[in-house]
Amino acid sequence: AVIGDAALLKAQGVPIVEVMAVSEAQARFATALPVIHHPLPTPVESGRPDPLNAPAVADGIELAVSLAVSGEASGVVTAPIAKAPMYASGFRFPGHTEFIAELTADAPYAGTRGPVMMLTARDLRACLVTIHVALDQAPQLVTAERIARTARVVHESLKRDFQIASPRLAMAALNPHAGEGGALGLQELEILIPTAARLRAEGVDISDPRPADTLFHEEARRTYDAAICMYHDQALIPVKTLDFW
């Protein structure tokens, strides 16, 4: 079911039917989009997000997550949010990923906690070490701890959620040519390579940093089950190039 303003969706010409619970949704999909009505306080003009509606948008995300945590829903599919009006309203999270992590922080979970953003396209799974940060901030945030946590979460998820018995991870380098032996940056020598070695000692099958410009072509993708990427566009450019909607 969609959690949203039923009147707004209906005005867009979308055939909808209001439902009171997620359990009612499956029987309705054949004829209309099932909607759990979650009204917005201010009229919406397409293409002009209003900060006055931002708290209701955040509340809708929180409601969806609560339904998943309680078991009423099997999962949550998020739609894009306009971040600038969200921030203007006082929303303090960089994006969905971090907000959902906060909402689920107290939920029972035995594995390594993220959050980790994984995006998939065809045979590619790309996972981010840094997420919604400016590019000039990303290198400072590419730490051994963040890389290791991301790799552990992905390793566990591939086994649990994708039934891959022995996951293979490819680490994308931060710098061009994987740093060229230190000539184009020291992060590979000082952070990425030692972290990969420690992870392998733990039983995580992860490569040393590989140049990102040759990591995502078809033949390369056959050599790993997920790529551990250092920053946002390093992961999202190949994903959206392969399968853009």
Descriptions of predicted regions:
Residues Y87-V116:
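Glycine/threonine-rich beta-strand-loop-alpha-helix active-site module
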Residues T31-P34, G114, R125:
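A generic secondary-structure signal marking the coil-to-beta-strand transition
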Residues A1-E98, L141, E145, R149-M230, ...:
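Contiguous, glycine/small-aliphatic-enriched amphipathic segments in soluble metabolic enzymes
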Residues M117-L141, E145-R149:
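Ligand-binding beta-strand-loop-alpha-helix segment within the catalytic cores
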Residues P15-I16, A107, V133:
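Alpha-helix boundary/capping residues
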Residues E24, A105-A107, P115-L119, K159-D161:
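A generic local secondary-structure boundary/capping motif
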